């Protein structure tokens, strides 16, 4: 049945988190740092990709991911390098995607897993077990013959529900992983789609590295999935994800405040810009300094 509500409860914790997140989003967007600073956006995008792939056991460090995306040679497994390039490509096309389109979801999976899996850009044809980072089985995915209808039903619910998008996007994330529609790449695509949904609520989320925060709290991420699996509904996972989103916003605002004229004098602000650049680059050229410091 279309638009069937997935099982979850709206708790006081969620309501408080949503209020705080809305306030933080307002503060972040008022500074205009993300929209006005392409270097900061690229840095956050790289952190996003590194975080999401690291959750899936990609071995590249943040510095190596940066080097790959800067066109440099990196000594690493070809599969890991391909994952970085594929992920960057689809994140760069985020604005083109319709978050409620099954076809766009399949397109995103096709790009994310291009050259890496046989069933790329299509729903899986075989049963699959879902495991955590230690190889423990969390649950078994939906039988393949039911996957297309369940994904369509989930997207229809997300599109038509009047529940706040902050909650809807978290519900999608959990239910998508529960269905496990693809042979591989479910985690990467699920987190991408969560970001996509949030970006439709507020464009700032397209550049907010929530995936990096999930990676930093990976044991909690899997614990929340396990707890929700045991409960048969996604309430605990939603609460975890809202806390991760809030933490990402606080981090972004802190970075933004450090870069603002009100927080430091112009010379110190320029040094902070350069330090931030060097977090994801091996070196800095004179031309980069001129762009960063507007000199």
Residue locations for each model-derived region?
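FIC/Doc superfamily catalytic core
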Residues: 1-295
């Amino acid at each position: 049945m279309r638009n069937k509500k997935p099982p979850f409860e709206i708790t006081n914790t969620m309501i408080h988190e949503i209020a705080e997140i809305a306030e933080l989003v307002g503060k972040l967007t008022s500074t205009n740092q993300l929209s006005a600073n392409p270097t900061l956006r690229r840095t956050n995008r790289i952190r996003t990709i590194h975080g999401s792939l690291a959750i899936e056991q990609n071995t590249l460090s943040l510095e190596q991911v940066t080097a790959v995306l800067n066109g440099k040679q990196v000594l690493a497994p070809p599969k890991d390098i391909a994952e970085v390039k594929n992920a960057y490509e689809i994140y760069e096309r985020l604005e083109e995607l319709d978050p409620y389109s099954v076809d766009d979801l399949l397109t995103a999976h096709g790009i994310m897993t291009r050259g890496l899996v046989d069933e790329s850009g299509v729903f899986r044809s075989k049963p699959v077990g879902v495991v955590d980072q230690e190889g423990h089985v969390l649950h078994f995915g939906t039988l393949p013959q039911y996957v297309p209808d369940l994904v369509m039903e989930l997207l229809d619910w997300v599109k038509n529900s009047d529940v706040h998008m902050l909650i809807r996007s978290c519900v999608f994330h959990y239910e998508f992983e529960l269905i496990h529609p693809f042979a591989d790449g479910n985690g990467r695509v699920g987190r991408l789609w969560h970001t996509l949904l949030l970006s439709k609520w507020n464009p700032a989320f397209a550049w907010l590295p929530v995936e990096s925060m999930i990676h930093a709290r990976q044991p909690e991420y899997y614990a929340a999935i396990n707890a929700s699996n045991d409960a048969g509904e996604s309430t605990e996972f939603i609460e975890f994800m809202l806390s991760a989103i809030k933490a990402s916003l606080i981090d972004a605002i802190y970075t933004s405040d450090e870069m603002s004229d009100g927080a430091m004098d112009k010379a110190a602000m320029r040094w902070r810009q350069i330090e931030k650049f060097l977090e994801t680059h091996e070196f800095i050229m004179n031309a980069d300094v001129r762009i960063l410091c507007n000199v």
